[in-house]
Amino acid sequence: MSEPPDQVTTLTKNTTMVLVLGATGMLGNAVLRFFAQSKGFEPVGTARSAAVLSLLPRELRERMACGFDVENVDSLVRLFAEVHPDVVVNCIGLVKQIAEADDPLQAIPINALLPHRLARLCQVAGARLVHISTDCVFAGTKGMYREEDPADAQDLYGRSKHLGEVDYPNAVTLRTSIIGLELASTHGLVAWFLAQAGPVRGFTRAVFSGLPTVELARVIRDHVLPRPQMRGLYHLSADPISKYDLLQLVAKAYGKAIEIAPDDKLVVDRSLDSKRFRQLTGYSPPAWPELVRAMRDFG
């Protein structure tokens, strides 16, 4: 698979408008906060309802656009017309841990159709789309998956996410996995772990290679946006780590005194080979202790 020449572009506009879709989710909230702290960027986040705004700091509430229904084309067009984005980061997606991910009437419109609709709108608006996909498009039977490996997930969630992976001249799909804290739930690994009081199991044969949300936001800013020629699908990953070892690092970084019992019963390896992305961009992920500390410090 040939690569385009690596041409890094300095964003010449004084301010780059970044529209963050799904800004109250785990990833979207981190992306919104990160770009709000980044010079030269003007982020605007979306939420379907204003009810969650009280969970955000005041400076972020002022950056939120509420009341837009992304499943309604007219509503999306109105959003684009109001924001005039240069970049759209799609952080919307039903996550695997909730029941709706198994409902085709909900999973297919959000996970499979919406990214393609966004790419079309971005094309009309002259904007660039950064879409976030997942390692769950794979069954997890072999690990170190490459972009050309067939997506072999058997569940609706994995299949719907695969259908939503966009490949257009103005769109990049980053296939990855994330950890981080959430605004109002404990679906994710870190929030769930920090909420536990008694002993927990740490799976020694469940392998993870994703990134903290703050690191993913940094990669988008520093490695994706300056490369307008980058398009299509790329794997983005850190070095593989077991869930047991990851929880040990999280416990140490957050000062969580809890027993983590090693458990080898769950065997799954969805680790991603991101050599293609690294060769194109020069990105080298930090070691896991550093990634976890950065996640803690970001909050």
Give residue ranges: language-model regions.
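C-terminal amphipathic/interface module of NAD(P)-dependent oxidoreductases
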Residues: 2-6, 256-299
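N-terminal Rossmann NAD(P)H-binding glycine-rich loop of SDR-like oxidoreductase domains
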Residues: 15-38
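N-terminal Rossmann-fold cofactor-binding loop
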Residues: 45-55, 69-70
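NAD(P)H-binding glycine-rich loop region in Rossmannoid oxidoreductase-like domains
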Residues: 67-110
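Glycine-rich NAD(P)-binding loop of the Rossmann-fold in SDR/ketoreductase-type enzymes
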Residues: 71, 102-117, 151, 159-162
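Conserved Rossmann-fold NAD(P)-dependent oxidoreductase catalytic core, especially the SDR/UDP-sugar
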Residues: 113-152
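NAD(P)-dependent short-chain dehydrogenase/reductase
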Residues: 154, 166-208, 214-215, 222
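Mid/C-terminal beta-alpha module of Rossmann-like enzyme folds, strongest
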Residues: 217-275
